[in-house]
């Protein structure tokens, strides 16, 4: 006599890739935050204030824009993994879960495009 629904048996490494990806994106975000904090401290110690010119000046070099874009993409991927897991774990109706996943993807893609547009307009 079987009790409950049959469950699909998955491999031992189920979820490992997502766990590693989330840790990697967290390391990228921490490294960028450290870089950003050091930049702010250097500007504050040399100029005494942090105005628009200093903020915009940080994103003038292409390497700075690329680093910021990598950090933004890492943040968005980190958010995707987390939100996908929340929707998959806590939203039971398949239709609602699918709708939430699609809305999340669309929102994150919009944020990525908007961030790139802002970065390259400086």
Identify the meaning behind each predicted range:
Residues 1-122:
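Membrane-embedded alpha-helical bundles that constitute the cytochrome b-like, heme-associated redox core
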